[in-house]
């Protein structure tokens, strides 16, 4: 009986040690308050109250290059892509401005092939590595069709991924970041509905 207990103890110790070693071998790219985390480039399609925003990260803090190429830097070589699926919950008109509020979910992917803006599905073809709740405010100038946005994401799921033989985790559960877009809306009814670029910065929880 004593021998059995000793074997059980050592098996447990090995499992704990292995788990600790695995955790320590992972590099977490932290979400830090006031630090620029991601640079984003994308497009969006609106249909009724539904909005899908998709694109890639052109810069990620912690990585020297967010592309698989050092010369071609666009959606075809992006290592990280994202898709946001959101629903409009409020629209307020004020002079030349239309203010739109949305909520939804954002997923960041480790891309596994060239993405193509003519096929939005290619931006979700990779491995999901971060999921977050999302709330957005859009301020659209209806005279110029230009817009600015601010939105907050709170991370709800993070998956370990491997890049160049190193295990990473993008962000931490419960942490939040704020993103600002500058964009141009397309002609109503045209595809895509518009284009945008911006940055994400860590925010205080």
Model segments located where?
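Bacterial N-terminal signal peptides that target proteins for export
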Residues: 1-11
């Amino acid at each position: 009986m004593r021998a059995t207990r000793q074997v059980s103890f050592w098996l447990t110790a090995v499992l704990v040690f292995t788990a600790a070693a695995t955790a320590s071998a992972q590099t977490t790219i932290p979400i830090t308050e006031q630090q620029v985390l991601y640079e984003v480039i994308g497009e969006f399609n609106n249909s009724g109250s539904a909005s899908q925003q998709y694109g890639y990260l052109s810069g990620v803090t912690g990585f020297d290059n967010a592309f698989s190429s050092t010369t071609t830097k666009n959606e075809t070589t992006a290592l990280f892509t994202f898709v946001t699926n959101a629903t409009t919950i409020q629209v307020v008109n004020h002079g030349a401005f239309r203010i739109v509020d949305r909520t939804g979910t954002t997923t960041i992917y480790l891309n596994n092939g060239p993405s193509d803006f003519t096929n939005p599905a290619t931006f979700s073809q990779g491995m999901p590595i971060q999921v977050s709740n999302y709330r957005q405010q859009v301020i659209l100038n209806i005279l110029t069709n230009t817009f600015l946005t601010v939105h907050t994401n709170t991370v709800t799921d993070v998956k370990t991924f491997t890049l160049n033989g190193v295990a990473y985790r993008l962000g931490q559960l419960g942490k939040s970041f704020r993103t600002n877009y500058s964009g141009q809306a397309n002609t109503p009814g045209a595809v895509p509905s518009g284009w945008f670029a911006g940055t994400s910065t860590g925010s205080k929880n």
